[in-house]
UniProtKB/Swiss-Prot annotation:
Record carries keyword Transferase: yes
PANTHER family, per the entry: AROM/DEHYDROQUINATE SYNTHASE, PENTAFUNCTIONAL AROM POLYPEPTIDE
Organism field: Rhizobium johnstonii (strain DSM 114642 / LMG 32736 / 3841) (Rhizobium leguminosarum bv. viciae)
GO cellular component term, pick one: cytoplasm
Catalytic residues as annotated in Swiss-Prot or TrEMBL: 326
Full protein name: 3-phosphoshikimate 1-carboxyvinyltransferase
Function of the protein: Catalyzes the transfer of the enolpyruvyl moiety of phosphoenolpyruvate (PEP) to the 5-hydroxyl of shikimate-3-phosphate (S3P) to produce enolpyruvyl shikimate-3-phosphate and inorganic phosphate.
UniProt-annotated binding residues for 3-phosphoshikimate: 28-29, 33, 173, 175, 326, 353
Top-level taxon: Bacteria
GO molecular function, one term: 3-phosphoshikimate 1-carboxyvinyltransferase activity
Gene: aroA
Catalytic activity: 3-phosphoshikimate + phosphoenolpyruvate = 5-O-(1-carboxyvinyl)-3-phosphoshikimate + phosphate
Region (Disordered): 1-23
Length: 452
């Protein structure tokens, strides 16, 4: 359930070939950062293609609460920022709902300010650990008051003068890296982040685009050193947000597993730190054609033509996990229809997502007749290319645990399974992909809400 709203069960059934051309909503990572950095920059920022899911809107509301002016003009969002270093103390707690990215990055953005700011979220977000972001802020001199286990609610109070730090990110996390860099914007001197494993680099690209003095060096081992000069001026920009690769994954995998499908997905973000899923599916034999590749706002963008394919199981390299961590649930669905076993390792990060995503996937697969093994940090799926025996003839419902990606992944599973697949709640899909149901049914997918 979302913000107290009633749950909405949904069912997906075996579908005929999916066809058509679709445009995916804007990338969630870039949308969050557009509101944050646009809200902080001097002058006007204009954004088209913004993802208008609840998570991103909550980030926008938080920026408004700290002095940014945000309005919508037609299809564009227009922001008048406060200027770097000029955020105002919020009058009330900042409520991020289900948005892990929003809350963690905003903690970095405002944590170093010399005022109190309190962060709250929904039941799911309140279970997620915040310590990985709070620890570097503590090193910068921020006073932290948090619930047990460094969970929400969290209250921060910045020092009079924050100290720049040199911080080595202890896990592959774009959120931690970004929080430290955003904290560095209001910190005198040079803030340095060392990243042993490269993660999505939208924060670095966008800060450079807004005029921050930021440099990136990569050594022979692939270790990145990012340096940011604090307290510089940021100037408003015009941003066109490309389609979200994590949302693209759902119609893309659906087309691969439903016989007779041939779809085109236009304007997809193809940043190399985000394309692990596409690479993995191609290794499995997926027919994914990248067309009209181009650069837009410093990011790689392309259209994808996707056709039904006979997939083979693979072992996914562990070092690919950071570039596709959000896509493992839908990759597991693709693996259900592949010949042989698909082995996914290095998945410990999935246990601290919107749900314990690894268990949620494994439990849902078993409920729907899939042969799989779950370990502490791995998942093995043995496929049935014909979909025979998959699904749940007894109307057993997948527990989504308030997790939008679990919900969408299992609805895709039902499109090629012998029996229907039903999930206990589709309401939270609105956090990241409000148009999901309409877009999928428009391609020919048999997905519908269940009348209770």
């Amino acid at each position: 359930m979302l913000n107290g709203s009633a749950s909405k069960p949904a069912t997906a059934r075996k579908s005929a070939g999916l066809t058509g051309s679709v445009r995916i909503p804007g990338d969630k990572s870039i949308s969050h950062r557009s509101f944050m950095i646009g809200g902080l920059a001097s002058g006007e920022t204009r954004i088209t293609g913004l993802l208008e899911g609840e998570d991103v809107i909550n980030t926008g509301r938080a920026m408004q609460a700290m002095g940014a002016r945000i309005r919508k003009e037609g299809a564009q969002w227009v922001i008048e920022g406060t200027g770097n270093g000029a955020l105002l103390a919020p009058d009330a707690p900042l409520d991020f709902g289900n948005a892990g990215t929003g809350v963690r990055l905003t903690m970095g953005l405002v944590g170093t300010y010399d005022f109190h700011s309190t962060f709250i979220g929904d039941a799911s977000l309140s279970k997620r650990p915040m310590g990985r972001v709070l620890n570097p802020l503590r090193e910068m001199g921020v006073q932290v008051s948090a619930s047990e286990g460094d969970r929400l609610p969290v209250t921060l109070r910045g020092p009079g003068t924050p100290s720049p730090i040199r911080y080595r990110v202890p896990m592959a996390s774009a959120q931690v890296k970004s929080a430290v860099l955003l904290a560095g914007l209001n910190t005198p001197g040079v803030t340095t982040v060392i990243e042993p494993v490269m993660t999505r680099d939208h924060t670095e690209k966008m800060l450079q685009g807004f005029g921050a003095a930021l440099s990136v060096e990569t050594d022979g081992d692939g270790v990145r050193t990012i340096r940011l000069e604090g307290r510089g001026k940021l100037a408003g920009q015009v941003i066109d947000v490309p389609g979200d690769p994590s949302s693209t994954a759902f119609p893309l995998v659906a087309a691969l597993i439903v016989p007779g499908s041939d779809i085109t997905i236009v304007n997809v973000l193809m940043n190399p730190t985000r394309t692990g899923l596409i690479l993995t599916l191609q290794e499995m034999g997926a027919d994914i054609e990248v067309v009209n590749a181009r650069l837009a706002g410093g990011e790689d963008v392309a259209d994808l033509r996707v056709r039904h394919s006979e997939l083979k199981g693979v072992t996914v390299p562990e070092d690919r996990a950071p570039s596709m961590i959000d896509e493992y649930p839908i990759l597991a669905v693709a693996a259900c229809f592949a010949e042989g076993a698909t082995v996914m390792k290095g998945l410990e990060e999935l246990r601290v997502k919107e749900s314990d995503r690894l268990s949620a996937v494994a439990d849902g697969l078993k409920l729907n007749g899939v042969d799989c093994d779950e370990g502490e940090d791995f998942l093995i799926v043995r496929g049935r290319p014909d979909g025979k025996g998959l699904g749940n003839a007894a109307d057993g419902r997948v527990s989504t645990h308030l997790d939008h990606r679990i919900a969408m992944s299992f609805l895709v599973l039902g499109l090629a399974s012998e029996h229907a697949v039903t999930i206990d709640d589709a309401a939270m899909i609105a956090t990241s992909f409000p148009e999901f149901m309409q877009l999928m049914t428009g391609l020919g997918a048999k997905i519908e809400l269940v009348a209770e």
